[in-house]
Amino acid sequence: MTCSVQPCEPDEQEDAGNRAVCPVLAIRQPIDHHSTVSEAPTDPRITVVVPTYNERENLPKLVGMLADLHLPNLGVLVVDDGSPDGTGDVAEQLGRDAAIPVSVLHRTTKDGLGRAYVAGIVRALDDGADIIVQMDADLSHPAEAIPRMVAELRNTDAAVVLGSRYVAGGAVAEDWPWHRKALSKWANVYVNTILRLKVRDATAGFKAWRSSTLRTIDVASVGSNGYAFQVEMNYRVIRHGLRIAEVPIRFEERVDGTSKMSLAVQLESAAVPWRLLRSNIGK
């Protein structure tokens, strides 16, 4: 409630000789809760989308790390592709027991990383997320980088923020296999040469997105799968005249389980940049 001053009526005033004091009436009026003049900024709703396939050992650790961030309005959406090791059941249990909200999107078809991410991102958008974070379940992405990525997104004009291995301050784990390091470096040179993305880590899978960016690039129509999905998402951002920012992270080797990198994924990753170059995205 607020107060306003009610002025004296003429008949309440006395002549100057009596020097009477005009009474001041404090009239209580309701606050306009829709006013934006003095409203404090609200914390954005953040959804971390985590695709899973046979990650029952890693998922509880990841959710615990995310809870330890104590970020307001942060929740997790697990997108499980029918993991035979029971990851989906573990995710459901986390939804009941975890310190932060955990929801699960169960898919019956294992049709690739890109399809899982699209399904999860579309669900998160439908649920009202303001910021959507892409994150692997294998603990290779450092959860502690998320506050910095979100801050970069909120305090600059960046459309998306990458957790980058290859900007100053970024690194990869010493125990990451040499052939994976070489393949990653080559893929970045290859993609940037063809598509001119002008980002250091074009194949990064750790990203914080504005919901408005994801709608602008029409994420539901992204056709690439596997790791090429990351490249197409970046390309759509650039083609729409938006800016990609990068913050340094240390990329770790997975803790448990096996890598999903296959020959088919590598072949798609080699072909997709040429397909994108011939597309009419952003035109």
Where does each model-flagged region fall?
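Cell-envelope/extracellular polymer assembly enzymes that use nucleotide-activated donors
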Residues: 45-47, 75, 232
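Hydrophobic helical membrane-anchoring modules
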Residues: 3, 8, 18-43, 189, ...
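A conserved acidic beta->alpha catalytic loop
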Residues: 80-89, 139
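Short beta-strand/loop segment that forms part of the nucleotide-sugar
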Residues: 73-83, 105
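Acceptor/aglycone-binding surface of glycosyltransferases and processive sugar-polymer synthases
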Residues: 107-126, 143-227, 254-268
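Short beta-strand-to-loop acidic/aromatic patch adjacent to the donor-nucleotide binding site
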Residues: 129-140
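Short, acidic, metal-binding catalytic loop of nucleotide-sugar glycosyltransferases
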Residues: 64-73
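Acidic helix N-cap motif at the loop->helix transition within catalytic regions
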Residues: 57-61, 85-94
